């Protein structure tokens, strides 16, 4: 019965053990006893005075967070609390619909701009992950909203409101990060073409043997910057200083992490960061990452201002289109933590 189901959320409801296709090799399991709790190791940036007299100090906080960690939390971010609450409720309601209603949106085609799927890339990977996800393209919203799920009833309206609000936040973050690199505040934004914005609503059902599998294994994000909304259940872990650190949810904050495109544009002044999602046997978990990215035709390369051959700061990466990078990212199916090395400039 379980084998015929498309989604792990429907498999989880009928099994008391992890099916063999979800079991990781012994050498690649979470080892939760070795995981540390974040404490103060993940920076928290208060954006309240970003546009006030303390801007320079906050920009310095961005520089420190991006260069030392690549992961940080933000508060006073401007996304209304009610908007966040409605988005999380809509996400829960979507995954609590009947199996027949949910699978209407199922597709394994990674090029589809709206799709429900499972794991990461089921057509390529060797071991499945304990995750279902609804992926939505959402900028420009008018190009995609009519293909989003129409149920629950308020889903499109709520998601559009959330996506619009988070995009405004991202544009503010990009200005701050650009300034923190010593660049004009619009430099990074102008590098990524017409811009792209995707969302994933990740659903991690309860798992009978969480020590055997992952929600998502260790990976780095392909995009420019990710803004993550978590529910109250812990599951995100970041690799820092040779250890996995659990990033426990903090109310009214977002988690922000840099992706591979920021690593390229900054010429490795800033780096994308390895992270993963683990599951548990007690509670389902929902996370909603917003992936902000270049448009597919955007040509990505290190910012010229950050290249100086005479001071031993050559361009580390060659020019490439984001479409080329994104296709490579999906094809790896997380067999590697990142595909960024294949885009390095030739040293021959």
From Swiss-Prot:
SUPFAM superfamilies tied to this protein: Clavaminate synthase-like
Pfam families: 2OG-FeII_Oxy, DIOX_N
Keywords: Dioxygenase, Iron, Metal-binding, NAD, Oxidoreductase, Plant defense
Binding annotation for 2-oxoglutarate: 285
Recorded superkingdom: Eukaryota
UniProt EC number: 1.14.11.-, 1.14.13.-
Stated family: Belongs to the iron/ascorbate-dependent oxidoreductase family.
Gene3D superfamilies assigned to the protein according to its UniProt record, in alphabetical order: B-lactam Antibiotic, Isopenicillin N Synthase, Chain (2.60.120.330)
Domain Fe2OG dioxygenase, chain residue ranges per copy: 194-294
Gene Ontology biological process terms, A to Z: defense response to oomycetes; salicylic acid catabolic process
Function: Converts salicylic acid (SA) to 2,3-dihydroxybenzoic acid (2,3-DHBA). Negative regulator of defense against Hyaloperonospora arabidopsidis.
A molecular function (GO) term: dioxygenase activity
InterPro entries, per the entry: DIOX_N, IPNS-like_FE2OG_OXY, IPNS-like_sf, Oxoglu/Fe-dep_dioxygenase_dom, Plant_2OG-oxidoreductases
Cofactor binding mode and count: Binds 1 Fe(2+) ion per subunit.
Residues engaged in binding Fe cation: 219, 221, 275
UniProt keyword Plastid, yes or no: no
Protein name per UniProt: Protein DMR6-LIKE OXYGENASE 2
Cofactor entry: Fe(2+)
Source organism phylogeny: Eukaryota, Viridiplantae, Streptophyta, Embryophyta, Tracheophyta
Catalytic activity: salicylate + NADH + O2 + H(+) = 2,3-dihydroxybenzoate + NAD(+) + H2O
């Amino acid at each position: 019965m379980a084998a015929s189901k498309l989604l792990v959320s429907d498999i989880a409801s009928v099994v008391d053990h992890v099916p063999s296709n979800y079991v990781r090799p012994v050498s690649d399991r979470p080892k939760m006893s070795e995981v540390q709790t974040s404490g103060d190791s993940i920076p928290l940036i208060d954006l309240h005075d970003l546009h006030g007299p303390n801007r320079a100090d906050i920009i310095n906080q961005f520089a420190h967070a991006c260069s030392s960690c690549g992961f940080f939390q933000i508060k006073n971010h401007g996304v209304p609390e009610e908007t966040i609450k409605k988005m999380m409720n809509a996400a829960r309601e979507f995954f609590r619909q009947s199996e027949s209603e949910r699978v209407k949106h199922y597709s394994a085609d990674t090029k589809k701009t709206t799709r429900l799927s499972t794991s990461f890339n089921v057509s390529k990977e060797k071991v499945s992950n304990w995750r279902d996800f609804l992926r939505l393209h959402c900028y420009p919203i008018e190009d995609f909203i009519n293909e989003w799920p129409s149920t629950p009833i308020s889903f499109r309206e709520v998601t559009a409101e959330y996506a619009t609000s988070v995009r405004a936040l991202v544009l503010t973050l990009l200005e701050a990060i650009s300034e923190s690199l010593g660049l004009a505040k619009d430099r990074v934004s102008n590098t990524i073409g017409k811009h792209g914005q995707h969302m994933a609503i990740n659903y991690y059902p309860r798992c009978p043997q969480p020590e055997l599998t992952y929600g998502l294994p260790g990976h780095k994000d392909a995009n420019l910057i990710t803004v993550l909304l978590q529910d109250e259940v812990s599951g995100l872990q970041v690799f820092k200083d040779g250890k996995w650190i659990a990033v426990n949810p903090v109310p009214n904050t977002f988690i922000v992490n840099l992706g591979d495109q920021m690593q390229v544009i900054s010429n490795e002044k800033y780096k994308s960061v390895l992270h993963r999602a683990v599951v548990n046997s007690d509670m389902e978990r929902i996370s909603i990452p917003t992936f902000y990215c270049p448009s597919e035709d955007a040509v990505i390369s290190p910012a010229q201002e950050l290249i100086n051959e005479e001071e031993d700061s050559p361009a580390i990466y060659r020019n490439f289109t984001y479409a080329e990078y994104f296709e490579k990212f999906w094809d790896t199916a997380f067999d590697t933590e990142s595909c960024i090395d294949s885009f390095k400039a030739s040293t021959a």
